[in-house]
Amino acid sequence: MPLFGSTFSPKKTPPRKSASLSNLHNLDRSTREVELGLDYGTPTMNLAGQSLKFENGQWIAETGISGGVDRREAQRLRRRNQQLEEENNLLRLKVDILLDMLSETTAESHLMEKELDELKSVSRRRK
């Protein structure tokens, strides 16, 4: 028997209400399309003056030429973009190396200045 009253007994939760009173889920796809007009067709969008449609998991330009840029031009631009990214990565690496060299040289110069100051103070004491 518990010291301060009865044992823990949570309140019973009320039963859930039915999720949907609609019978739309009972209809097959073709009936829903006819009755409700749910035939949307392929998704399309207009981006920067270029009309695209979604087919087989990919966005495809509706015209043969995608907004004035043909496939060869797009491929050339991709290659140029790749070259520029590689060049950018190389330049970042060079900057990192130069910064490392600068910090190393700065540390060495501070050490030399410190040694020089110590030698000057020792030579002053001897005089």
Curated annotation (Swiss-Prot):
Region ranges (Leucine-zipper): 77-98
GO biological process, one term: cell projection organization
Chain segments carrying region Minimal region for the interaction with PKD2: 60-112
InterPro entries listed in its UniProt record: Chibby_fam (IPR028118)
Residue ranges the record marks as coiled coil: 68-125
PTM sites of type Phosphoserine: S9, S20
GO CC annotation terms, alphabetical: centriole; Golgi apparatus; nuclear speck; nucleus; sperm flagellum
Domain of life where this protein originates: Eukaryota
Region listing for Disordered, in residue ranges: 1-26
Keywords, alphabetical: Cell projection, Cilium, Cilium biogenesis/degradation, Coiled coil, Cytoplasm, Cytoskeleton, Differentiation, Flagellum, Golgi apparatus, Nucleus, Phosphoprotein
Polar residues: bias regions: 1-10
Compartments where found: Nucleus speckle; Cytoplasm, Cytoskeleton, Cilium basal body; Cytoplasm, Cytoskeleton, Microtubule organizing center, Centrosome, Centriole; Golgi apparatus
Function noted in UniProt: Inhibits the Wnt/Wingless pathway by binding to CTNNB1/beta-catenin and inhibiting beta-catenin-mediated transcriptional activation through competition with TCF/LEF transcription factors. Has also been shown to play a role in regulating the intracellular trafficking of polycystin-2/PKD2 and possibly of other intracellular proteins. Promotes adipocyte and cardiomyocyte differentiation.
Note: 'Chibby' is Japanese for 'small'; the gene was so named for the RNAi phenotype seen in flies.
Subunit structure of this chain's protein: Homodimer. Homodimerization is essential for nuclear localization and interaction with KPNA4 but is dispensable for interaction with CTNNB1. Interacts with polycystin-2/PKD2 and GM130. Interacts with the C-terminal region of CTNNB1. Interacts (C-terminus) with TCIM (C-terminus), TCIM competes with CTNNB1 for the interaction with CBY1. Interacts with FAM92A; this interaction facilitates targeting of FAM92A to cilium basal body. Interacts with CIBAR2. Interacts with KPNA4.
Family: Belongs to the chibby family.
Name of protein: Protein chibby homolog 1
Organism: Bos taurus
Encoding gene (name): CBY1
